[in-house]
């Protein structure tokens, strides 16, 4: 059936807000809007966080290097958001100290001290410790010629889970979240948006909405141009960022921020107890955002930066995994990809009887919540009964009544000490927080967790992720929601595929009966 011939749904199915895109900005806006009493529909053509939002450096940070580009508003907002997100989701956001080795020929010490002074004082800081100078001794993992440096605080986050938790928060406030669902066309009609949707199985349906939010990330301009047949108010620059994952590079829970000769920086970040993330790069990208992959040049670049700083030398043979994403930045005509603003721009059109559309250009993981508040402020004139902002103090799912993940492991020890792998209870706590008890509801013995598929993953957890977190494919579970893809064999990953296929066949038989 041609989308243009799809019948419009009855008026009872009109939503206040329809959101295109299941990345961090889309789900953040959906949650904010739903919590203000608006009816919300969100569609994502793939899985939640399946592109940019799961390919970040996994940091909640002010952006120390943005100070060099005079982005004081963005840095101030991001610094304040660190503490907000620490309180909202303590199971997936944690404090982290960052060590900055001093290389005098790149940036003088006074410049770094001035930047760190601003970093300490621009934003509200209660939980995070301030910066200080360091001297490195013989036990330092850094090369012997690097004798001094600095240390400051930022935060680490499980980026994909941050997206999923916001989607769950939106659903718990009444939003309808549809993954594997693509908006194939939309047009204005009688003061509403009429939107045509296609599910992964090819089935079609339509909805109507009073306002449309385009949070399609790398596809934001393409959606306006190709699916809405309108002109995009801004251009988009796709900047590729790639990362390496290697075995743990050094002891300790601190990250390093490494200065390079080209004035860029590269992070080394402790990851999942046994690994280190290295990244990121900045390069223009012109291909399909869904097919981005690390280049040979990026790999060599990051290895060279790390090997210039650390005693332990890395080669390609040390690489466990790589991942890449594209950052959809608002085109500010900068010649240097690293200098393009990471701030967001919201473009609103409509009014005077014409249904509004709000498009999101740019943005960064750290400031998604403030972006959502700004989006709702722009839409407020169209929804005069909308309730006030609410997300600053509200916990995300799993963060309720928690201060640290360790609390989850102490609350009901009988429930999680089941003879499973030693790391399983802590992994559950740092993945699901206080929602671990929903995962383990009724579990009294190891057998209640179902079959072991590999890497500490049991069928009970797979069932939970499918029922509660929109997981449908092995990669949704292994790479975005649990990260167990890094610790499972190809055969074990096939076990997950076989189990999902079996469950799907059983469900299909029940529905057909």
From Swiss-Prot:
<protein>
    <recommendedName>
        <fullName>Glycerol-3-phosphate dehydrogenase</fullName>
        <ecNumber>1.1.5.3</ecNumber>
    </recommendedName>
</protein>
<dbReference type="GO" id="GO:0046168">
    <property type="term" value="P:glycerol-3-phosphate catabolic process"/>
</dbReference>
<dbReference type="InterPro" id="IPR036188">
    <property type="entry name" value="FAD/NAD-bd_sf"/>
</dbReference>
<dbReference type="Pfam" id="PF16901">
    <property type="entry name" value="DAO_C"/>
</dbReference>
<dbReference type="Pfam" id="PF01266">
    <property type="entry name" value="DAO"/>
</dbReference>
<keyword id="KW-0319">Glycerol metabolism</keyword>
<dbReference type="InterPro" id="IPR031656">
    <property type="entry name" value="DAO_C"/>
</dbReference>
<keyword id="KW-0285">Flavoprotein</keyword>
<feature type="binding site">
    <location>
        <begin position="16"/>
        <end position="44"/>
    </location>
    <ligand>
        <name>FAD</name>
    </ligand>
</feature>
<dbReference type="GO" id="GO:0005737">
    <property type="term" value="C:cytoplasm"/>
</dbReference>
<dbReference type="GO" id="GO:0004368">
    <property type="term" value="F:glycerol-3-phosphate dehydrogenase (quinone) activity"/>
</dbReference>
<dbReference type="InterPro" id="IPR000447">
    <property type="entry name" value="G3P_DH_FAD-dep"/>
</dbReference>
<keyword id="KW-0963">Cytoplasm</keyword>
<keyword id="KW-0560">Oxidoreductase</keyword>
<comment type="similarity">
    <text>Belongs to the FAD-dependent glycerol-3-phosphate dehydrogenase family.</text>
</comment>
<dbReference type="GO" id="GO:0006071">
    <property type="term" value="P:glycerol metabolic process"/>
</dbReference>
<keyword id="KW-0274">FAD</keyword>
<dbReference type="InterPro" id="IPR006076">
    <property type="entry name" value="FAD-dep_OxRdtase"/>
</dbReference>
<dbReference type="InterPro" id="IPR038299">
    <property type="entry name" value="DAO_C_sf"/>
</dbReference>
């Amino acid at each position: 059936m041609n989308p243009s011939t799809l019948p419009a749904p009855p008026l009872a199915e009109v939503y206040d807000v329809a959101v295109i895109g299941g990345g961090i900005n889309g789900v953040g806006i959906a949650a904010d809007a739903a919590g203000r009493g608006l009816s919300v529909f969100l569609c994502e053509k793939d899985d939640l966080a399946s592109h940019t939002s799961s390919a970040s450096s996994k940091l909640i940070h002010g952006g120390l290097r943005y100070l060099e580009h005079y982005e004081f508003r963005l840095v101030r907002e991001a610094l304040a958001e660190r503490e907000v997100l620490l309180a909202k989701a303590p199971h997936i956001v944690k404090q982290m100290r960052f060590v900055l080795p001093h290389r005098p020929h790149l940036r003088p010490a006074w410049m770094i001290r001035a930047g760190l002074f601003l970093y300490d004082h621009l934003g509200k800081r209660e939980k995070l410790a301030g910066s200080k100078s360091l001297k490195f001794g013989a036990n330092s993992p850094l090369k012997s010629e690097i004798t001094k440096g600095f240390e400051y605080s930022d935060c680490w986050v499980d980026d994909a889970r941050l997206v999923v938790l916001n989607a769950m928060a939106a659903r718990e406030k009444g939003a309808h979240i549809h993954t594997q669902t693509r908006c194939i066309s939309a047009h204005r009609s009688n003061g509403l948006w009429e939107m045509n949707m296609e599910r992964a199985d090819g089935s079609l349906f339509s909805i109507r909405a009073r306002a449309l939010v385009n949070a399609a990330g790398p596809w934001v301009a393409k959606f306006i141009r190709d699916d809405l047949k309108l002109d995009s108010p801004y251009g988009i620059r796709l900047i590729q960022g790639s990362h390496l994952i290697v075995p743990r590079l050094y002891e300790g829970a601190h990250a390093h921020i490494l200065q390079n000769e080209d004035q860029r920086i590269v992070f080394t970040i402790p990851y999942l107890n046994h690994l280190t993330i290295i990244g990121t790069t900045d390069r223009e990208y012109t291909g399909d955002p869904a097919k981005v992959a690390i280049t040979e040049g990026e790999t060599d670049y990051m290895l060279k930066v790390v090997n210039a700083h650390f005693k332990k030398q890395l080669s390609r043979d040390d690489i466990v995994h790589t991942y890449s994403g594209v950052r959809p930045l608002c085109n500010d005509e900068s010649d240097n990809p690293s200098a393009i603003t990471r701030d967001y721009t919201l473009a609103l059109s409509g009014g005077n009887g014409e249904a509004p559309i709000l498009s999101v250009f740019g943005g960064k993981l750290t400031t998604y919540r403030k972006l959502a508040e700004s989006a709702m402020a722009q839409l407020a004139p169209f929804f005069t009964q909308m309730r006030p902002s609410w997300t600053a103090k509200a916990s995300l799912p799993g963060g309720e009544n928690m201060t640290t993940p360790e609390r989850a492991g102490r609350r009901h020890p009988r429930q999680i000490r089941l003879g499973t792998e030693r790391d399983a209870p802590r992994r559950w706590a740092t993945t699901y927080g206080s929602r671990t008890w929903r995962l383990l509801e009724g579990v009294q013995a190891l057998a209640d967790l179902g079959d072991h598929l590999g890497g500490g993953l049991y069928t009970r957890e797979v069932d939970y992720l499918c029922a509660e977190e929109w997981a449908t494919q092995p990669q949704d579970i292994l790479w975005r929601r649990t990260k167990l893809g890094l610790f499972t064999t190809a055969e074990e990953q096939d076990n997950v595929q076989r189990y999902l296929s079996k469950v799907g066949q059983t469900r299909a038989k029940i529905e057909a009966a």
